[in-house]
Amino acid sequence: FRTFLIIAEVILVFSGSFSKTLSASIRCGYIIAKPEWIDQLTDLKIATSFSHNGVSAEVLLSALTDGSYRKHIELLKVRLAKAMHDTITQLEPLGIKPWIKPQAGIFVWCHLPKGVEASEIAKYCINHQVILAPGNAFSQASNAGQFIRFNVTQSNHDHIYKTLADAIQQESS
């Protein structure tokens, strides 16, 4: 909680939600701001919202107050760390190396083998029901085409790695 107070003093307004960590169906978020702004921000929220999901708010309140959200997050961190490790382990034999090994999160940016273009890999893969995010979709940097982003929560299928291997082989020849 102390961190949030520090954020409120330094940053003008910070908002977030629980849709990525708890459930996409829980459309309930939070805002961190200077205490003197909260009433006005609450009024603005009420004035611009068409509905309020009381059930979602009650579920969230319960999860936050009874400790189940904290337990859920701890388990989620363990699952994501395993998914990150497994994804990186599966990619390395293909010559796909993490640009940086993330300490947490759902994404890992990887550097493709020399001479392999991310957009070509993504085109091949999409035709084989594998959707990837090439670096040049995110950046205009001259080397962006050498990078690809993987969502580790969606990278636990052997079909992905077989398709990647085939795409790299085709692109390299």
Regions found by a protein language model. Give the residues of each.
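Conserved glycine-rich beta-strand-loop-beta hairpin in the small C-terminal domain of fold type I
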Residues: 77-88, 98-111, 126
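Conserved PLP phosphate-binding loop immediately N-terminal to the Schiff-base lysine helix
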Residues: 1-3
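Conserved core segment of the aminotransferase class I/II
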Residues: 8-78
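PLP-dependent enzyme catalytic core of the Aspartate aminotransferase-like
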Residues: 127-128, 141-173
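Conserved C-terminal alpha-helix-loop-beta "cap" of PLP-dependent enzymes
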Residues: 111-149
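Residue-level recognition of strand-loop junctions within catalytic nucleotide-signaling folds
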Residues: 34-35, 65, 111-113, 153-155
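Inter-domain helical "communication" segments and dimerization helices
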Residues: 65-69, 120, 172
